[in-house]
Amino acid sequence: MSSKLDSPTASPSGGNAIPDAETLRRVWRETVDKELLGVPFEKKLVTRTADGIDLQPLYHRGMVEAVPHCDTLPGQAPFLRGAHARGAKGEIAWRIAQAIPAASAADFNKALLAALERGQNAVLLPAAFAADGGTLAAALKDIHFAGAPVLAPVGASAAAIEQTFGSALKSRGEQWSALQGAVTADPLSALAATGKLGLTLEAATAELAAWTAFAAKNAPAVKTIGVDAGFVVEGGGNSAQELAVAIAMAVEYFRRLEAAKVDAKTAAPRFAFSFAIGSQFFPELAKFRAFRLLWSRVVSAYGDASLAAQATVHARTALFNKTVLDPYVNMLRTTTEALSAVLGGVDSVQVGAFDEVVRTPDEFSQRIARNIAIMLSEEFNFAEVADAAGGSWLVEKYTDELARKAWAIFQTIEKQGGFAAALAAGEIQKLVAASAADKRKALDTRRLSVLGTNLFPNLKEKPLGASTQAATPAAPAPATAAVTVTPVKAWRAAEGFEALRAISERYAAANGGKRPQVFLAKMGPVKQHKPRADFSAGFFAVAGFEATGKQAFESAEEAAKAAAASGAPIAVLCSTDDTYPTLVPAFASTLKAAKPGIVAILAGLPADAATVESFKKAGIDDFIHVRANLRDMLAQLLAKIGAK
């Protein structure tokens, strides 16, 4: 072999040596800067995520050299790459724990057994069916806990757990040691999500301490302490906030349980965490890895880092980004969300049915949701790979940055007196509200898009029919509230736009099926009007407006007369910035003379305020553009035409 080819930097063709990595990156950056033609690199190619972290267009080894966890393996502290060394053929890497709606415990059991035969391998037990021993026994009839562990978040109070589960186990002829899974109480998240508790936190902690101590002696395979931070995401918060809140709640439980004579060594293995899965694939994947890192750090502070591996993580697809409109797109959303969770190393996953925000999920939607989780494991074989994302420079760097962001937020909560004190003072609510406000603004300007709702809506879609599936009864609510706070209220990204479409549908129903209309006054050749005509049609379609006006016009007067004659209450002039100074005065004056009540809109926003003012004086009522508040503007226009 030649000496040239022996060199690790030699060109395979025998030419010049391959430049080192630093030189290649420098050349790449110089080439990119040249192509950007003066546009700042950071503005064009760097994306700021909701967590306040910059996503780079290119990641390289140098970015992760200082990241401390990169040389660890799955099953090794700090367990960022998973609590266990996974990847063996046939090994269950994660449990599939699907929600099963049912009107009674018997119906639930029947549907559950059928689901277990079709690939589900964990029981997600509704709190309503854990209210008494008889109901619980009926719900869990013929369920073998070794093959299908039970996940039962019972709510704020642990008082009845020992009696109800003890009674159910006795009726089955089994000991407590047979029970596997997580039977958890979580008063802190219940208080945050609902704003009230039927008992004091001190009383709730005493119940949780008693249940945890009992389980530690009698039910070694059962988690008892729930920490559900999903309310942060459902309230519009970001991943860093969700992680910080989860850690803050766990530390609050540690303190309170220690005061109730349950030490950290007993409590740490009993934690069962739950998170909502958001829509951003890589940040969500990194979130679950970052959680393990943070949890290991917390448990290490209490004396034994190895105990961190025993906590379990359940992930459920969030409701925040699910839609009533174009609901079949929800299947795509839940698929990528579930994938990010399982690649992030969760212990169990719950995939929401595509119609869950529309109606009680039917048999079809439940089957599709279950099959998504099964396919990730059985067909795509992700269960056979340990930490498949490990080693990705993007994932490793983002994991590290996200963990640091979350830890900083956690420290702020601690300075506020811990989670309970911060919640009582409204600080947790303010934290989430700030992120939610940013998301609302991004949604309203379509910087954050919801496909089928505020982007590319389908006005011809047929709504889903009513479900014949009975809903699961709600768990008993406390008669009185012993503790109250302002709740972190859940909302959905699409709900404001869905409300606009509902107004539009009512308008159509009251007008013989005719939707509210907007006339597009297209000027000149296709290249002159098409970009803004397409933008305008999409803009108004978000609120259910039908765009009319197929032909293009040579003169502004012609366009104005056609708009007035169309019967549409709104007309949009679609052309280019350089033609508007000539077109606007003639169009607006002719239009208002022919039909004084019509709303005149200009597609585009002039760069200077003086031109905007002159166009308004000419008769233009408003402007639509990429920075416009879409939702507010459409709501105002619907109101102007009498739609309610």
Report each predicted region and the residues it spans.
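Intrinsic disorder at enzyme termini
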Residues: 2-26, 41-47, 51-83, 347, ...
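A general structural motif
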Residues: 329-332, 550-556
